[in-house]
Curated annotation (Swiss-Prot), chain A:
This is Mediator of RNA polymerase II transcription subunit 17. Component of the Mediator complex. It is found in: Nucleus. Belongs to the Mediator complex subunit 17 family. The gene is mdt-17. The keyword Transcription regulation applies. InterPro entries: Mediator_Med17. GO terms for biological process: regulation of transcription by RNA polymerase II.
Swiss-Prot record, chain B:
Component of the Mediator complex, a coactivator involved in the regulated transcription of nearly all RNA polymerase II-dependent genes. Mediator functions as a bridge to convey information from gene-specific regulatory proteins to the basal RNA polymerase II transcription machinery. Mediator is recruited to promoters by direct interactions with regulatory proteins and serves as a scaffold for the assembly of a functional preinitiation complex with RNA polymerase II and the general transcription factors. It comes from the Eukaryota. GO terms for molecular function: transcription coactivator activity. Component of the Mediator complex. Keywords: Activator, Developmental protein, Nucleus, Transcription, Transcription regulation. GO terms for cellular component: mediator complex. It comes from Caenorhabditis elegans. It is found in: Nucleus. This is Mediator of RNA polymerase II transcription subunit 20. The lineage of its organism: Eukaryota, Metazoa, Ecdysozoa, Nematoda, Chromadorea. Belongs to the Mediator complex subunit 20 family. PANTHER family: MEDIATOR OF RNA POLYMERASE II TRANSCRIPTION SUBUNIT 20 (PTHR12465:SF0), UBIQUITIN SPECIFIC PROTEASE HOMOLOG 49 (PTHR12465). One of its GO terms (biological process) is regulation of transcription by RNA polymerase II.
Length: 667, 198
């Protein structure tokens, strides 16, 4: 109920009475001028007492009184409706809400039903309008235009024209037409050429051009070529990382005008820088500095053999060379020149080693009397074979080191998250966070060694290896029993290992697994010196002296001989073997030199045999009567009698031992 | 880098140096340790203060410890020297307290190659606060291995300070590695004590 100018009270069809009333056509209208409260009474003093209008609850109460409740609910039903069986409700007539009734009564729509219908419709229309607006606002399906907006046709912008598919097709067609024209022209020319057999000037020029470009392409497979304006130039420098196309190392490329008598020359003419117009070679060798080689170490200043340099008079000859050769030689010259310069600079920095540089020859002290010699040789810039001088192995190693140096990145590349360019090795990256102290930082800061230092190591090792193979050859040649065989176990650039194997022919069956300790020994070679090592781990340092190496090998042979004697005396097929009384591998002779010895005794205990093996000399054999009782012995009866070794029966040591043991078995 | 024991000495640095030279120590060089507290601009209990330290033994490192009640609860970190530069950018949260900075400068002696003893004078600003001795046993980084030997060493050389052990010696029972941060924790404790001293 709303207060307004017109107070309308529609009738609510709640009770039965009201439904049965006749349908009225009009509506009760009560017009009041304002919504003053009704005056109940006016007091004598002029105070008006108002009749308070009904509140909602009052109004509901008034209506509720009009309803005949007993008719609705029924007298029999209990107060609480919830326990009532829903079936019972059907007995009541016209229950207010939700009741099934046989008599279907069309509900009266009421006087405002059409208004409601129109309002509902307009509400629906508004809802759909709202939907449309929201759709247009959030999507691109429709664009809202005001009534006054002119409808413009969008002109195609240059962008849209270019991305338009139609235009692209047009361009493709135009390009294809151009290609067709070119091919047509080519076809015509080819026909003309085939009919003329290619003698027109045009065709010759065309041939030359194609030939030029083909050869240029060949050249570009190996060399860096660049076009600057109208000139084509190439680069002779060999660095992978660093500046390229540096002025001193570029060569010009031009087209040679072919005339008829130069058929075998290439159409590309290159002009190599004049100072690189020679062939070079860097020879490395190990030389000995003694009186005889005095003048041979350096070059004779009057000798012109390796000192070629470019002269203007040679320019014609140079022009006749094929670019493949001349560029290769020129780059090699550049490379070797730079390497020699670097090596000389490094040599000057090495303060502890003496070095002399003169006339493109560098001599640096290796060890003892030996020097390492680097010589840069120049040869004329023409075809022909150049004899390789110096030690071929060292030449190759030097070449490999140069290339390895060029390929090594000393600066770490930048990574995905940009990191600073740094020289420090990766192992030092966490030196701050790891709390490394100074000693640890130094340890991890591995610095690269120069080529010269590495060459020195390799060359000294090579000299020592040559020396040891020499000694091994001598040892194996002179020793008859035991026979010594040697082989390389490990050959490296700065360390190698050689194994010596000793055997006695015809007596191998006596060598069991026990004796393998004595029958094998090794020589370890580093770049500083040689060390002879026995299988049970005893090392004999031989520095760089070949005599000492020989001595060590011979000592090992003596130890082996002792073992042979003891093995043979035990494993004899004779019924009565000999007894080893004592054996000493570390014994010394009167002069203090090592002389392993062994004393045997026969089974009958009548004789003692003493073998003394001196290093590098014939063994000595002594015999005496066996001392039965130390206290009662008479020294003159038990003197050692030396036997003449060379007159013993048998060719080798083992055979002599065999024969001797047989003889002394029972005597 | 070995197990280290840092303590405050009650004698002058010179007397300690003379003592070391008498038992055969060789002067190795100089060292410097500095301890700088960093505080928030307005003192508050929510934001704790941080202490940044450097030690010349680890020249590329910076140590940062936020001291709380116990050793295990204090956040500690080792970083490279760039940390100092970063800290200057964080001046809205942490400001260096240069008045409270303590520097320990002195000499280091090496004894028979295994022991490194550093003796330094601790100064705060211009006032000298005390003398600090650091004993490092290089070969071992396991505390329980060399704890007893170090106590014996201190007893035999100084005869005075061997009773108060550093915290790390007391709390470590298992064979754990000793790190540079443990040394700096000891320095932190000593620096705090020195700051309170007048």
């Amino acid at each position: 109920m709303e207060d307004g100018d017109e107070v309308v009270e529609p009738i609510e069809p709640e009770s039965e009475d009201i439904v049965n009333l006749t349908k009225r056509l009009g509506v009760d209208l009560v017009l009041e001028s304002n919504d003053d409260w009704k005056i109940q009474e006016i007091g004598f003093d002029g105070v008006e007492r108002y009749l308070q209008p009904e509140t909602f609850t009052d109004h509901v109460g008034k209506l509720a009184r009009k309803v005949e409740w007993t008719k609705l609910v029924g007298t029999k039903s209990p107060y609480e409706n919830s326990k009532v069986d829903p079936e019972d409700e059907l007995d009541d007539e016209n229950v207010a809400k939700g009741g099934l009734n046989e008599e279907l009564v069309t509900p009266e729509a009421g006087p405002w039903s059409s208004v409601a219908k129109y309002l509902h419709e307009s509400l629906n229309q508004l809802n759909s309008l709202l939907d449309v607006i929201s759709v247009t606002k959030s999507t691109d399906y429709m664009k809202a235009l005001t009534v006054l907006d002119p409808i413009t046709v969008q002109e195609p912008t240059p962008e849209t024209i270019s991305t338009n598919r139609g235009t692209q097709w047009i361009w493709k067609r135009r390009a294809l037409q151009e290609a067709v024209q070119v091919l047509d022209m080519a076809q015509k020319q080819r026909q003309r050429a085939s009919s003329n057999l290619g003698l027109s000037a045009d065709y010759m020029a065309h041939l030359q051009r194609t030939k030029f470009f083909e050869e240029l392409r060949e050249m570009r497979e190996i060399w860096r070529v660049r076009k600057v304006g109208d000139y084509i130039c190439g680069d002779l420098s060999y660095h992978i990382f660093g500046w390229k196309y540096d002025t001193p190392a570029i060569f010009d490329i031009s087209r040679r005008s072919l005339s008829n008598n130069m058929e075998n020359l290439s159409i590309i003419e290159v002009s190599v820088p004049k100072d690189l117009a020679r062939r070079s070679m860097l020879a490395v060798s190990i030389v000995q500095d003694d009186i005889q080689s005095g003048n041979g170490l350096f070059r004779d200043p009057k000798d012109k053999k390796y000192t070629y340099s470019y002269r203007e008079s040679d320019s014609e000859k140079v022009k006749l060379l094929h670019w493949k050769d001349s560029l290769k030689w020129a780059q090699n010259t550049l490379l070797l020149r730079d390497v020699f310069k670097t090596i000389c600079t490094d040599a000057i920095k090495l303060r502890n080693r003496l070095s002399i540089i003169r006339d493109n020859v560098l001599l640096i002290h290796l060890f003892d009397d030996y020097l390492l010699r680097f010589e840069l040789q120049w040869f004329p810039f023409q075809t022909g074979e150049i004899k390789e001088e110096g030690d071929i192995y060292l030449n190759r190693v030097l070449r490999e080191m140069i290339i390895g140096f060029e390929c090594t990145k000393f600066i770490r590349p930048q990574f995905f998250c940009s990191m600073p360019v740094t020289h420090l090795p990766e192992a030092l990256d966490l030196r701050g966070c790891g709390g490394f102290n100074t000693a640890q930082i130094e340890e991890r800061a591995v610095r690269s060694r120069s080529i010269l230092q590495r060459m020195l190591d390799v060359a000294s090792h090579r000299a020592l290896v040559t020396m040891v193979s020499d000694v091994a050859e001598r040892v194996s040649r002179i020793s008859l029993d035991p026979t010594v065989q040697y082989r390389w176990l490990n050959c490296g650039r700065t360390t190698s290992r050689m194994m010596f194997n000793m055997t006695s022919k015809d007596f191998e069956m006596y060598i069991g697994t026990i004796s393998s300790v004595r029958s094998v020994f090794f020589a370890n070679i580093s770049s500083d010196g040689v060390e002879v090592e026995t299988k049970d781990g005893i090392k004999m340092k031989c520095q760089r002296d070949p005599a000492r190496v020989m001595y060590a090998c011979q000592y090992a042979m003596c130890c082996y001989s002792v073992t042979m004697v003891s093995t043979m005396s035990r494993n004899n097929n004779w019924v009565t073997p000999f007894q080893t009384m004592c054996a000493n591998v570390f014994a010394l002779d009167e002069r203090g030199n090592p002389a392993p010895n062994i004393v045997l005794c026969n089974q009958a205990a009548t004789r003692s045999i003493l073998f003394v093996f001196h290093v590098g000399m014939e063994p000595e054999v002594f015999v005496r009567r066996f001392i039965v009782n130390e206290e009662t012995m008479k020294p003159e009866e038990h003197e050692w009698k030396k036997l003449c070794y060379s007159r013993l029966h048998g060719a080798t040591l083992c055979r002599k031992i065999d024969a001797l043991l047989v003889f002394l078995r029972d005597h | 880098m070995g197990v280290t024991w840092v303590f405050e000495a009650e004698q002058t640095a010179k007397s300690v140096e003379r003592l070391l030279e008498s038992i055969g120590g060789d002067l190795h060089g100089t060292f410097i340790v500095d301890v700088t507290p960093f505080n928030p601009p307005t003192p508050s209990s929510d934001y704790p203060s941080n202490v940044v330290m450097h030690h010349s033994k680890c020249p590329q490192s910076t140590f940062s410890i936020c001291p709380k009640d116990t050793f295990k609860k204090s956040p500690k970190a080792v970083c490279d020297r760039g940390f100092d530069l970063i800290l200057s950018k964080l001046s809205s949260g942490l400001i260096a307290d240069n008045a409270g900075k303590i520097e320990i400068i002195g000499n280091e002696y090496s004894l028979y190659k295994d022991w490194m003893i550093r003796v330094g004078t601790a100064t705060q600003g211009t006032t000298v606060k005390g003398v600090v001795v650091e004993i490092e046993y290089d070969p071992s980084i396991i505390v329980i291995q060399c704890k007893d030997m170090m106590i014996e060493f201190v007893k035999s050389v100084f005869n005075k300070y061997h009773e108060t052990l550093p915290e790390i010696f007391k709390i470590t029972e298992k064979p754990e590695s000793y790190t540079a941060l443990d040394t700096m924790w000891q320095y932190l404790g000593i620096a705090t004590k020195l700051r309170k001293k007048t």
